[in-house]
Amino acid sequence: MGMVSRYADMPPVIIKPRLEDPSIKKASANTNRILQEIGENPVALNTLAMEQSKLRPLFKDFDAENVSPEELGDFGKQLLAFGLVDNLTADLMGRAALEFDKDGKITHPDVKINALEFFAKRIDEMQTKVLTGDKYSKLLLPDYIKTVHVMKNLQVFASTGDSYGTMALNKRIKDGEKIKDELLPAKLKSKV
């Protein structure tokens, strides 16, 4: 009998590197870890009131991972004007920038950034400072976390047009649960 080698007559394999879209900026592993640590807060932004007021057209272009500091500040001002966020959250959204000039103004207000990554880095820095006893960081940390929750909720609302409550009710209906008509928003009444 002849000897059989596992390397004999194998067809050649060519591995091509996957082409990636340079416009897509991926978050680092540290950013993803921090975002997972702070979790979700579906009630950080009252998207049900936004849904009922039909505010989706104002926010339909919102993408927290690809937004300029100027746009993020405008979105924060709009949320503040409708009474959906407090002044500090709107202010934090308006100050998300990588570079400032000597007068404290944003140097490149139209350059797109990943706002979630920006805030995750600040949260990481603050968590480190809190461990060393920095009281100012300890005071501001919850506000930065709330701002991330608001941006995440706004991104879901902008992409789907639904509030967290509507999405939860929709899931319950799909699972076969019977819900009274008076508890349902108008667009879900037809699904029951």
Task: For the regions a language model picked out, list residue spans one by one.
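Type III/flagellar secretion export determinants
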Residues: M1-V192
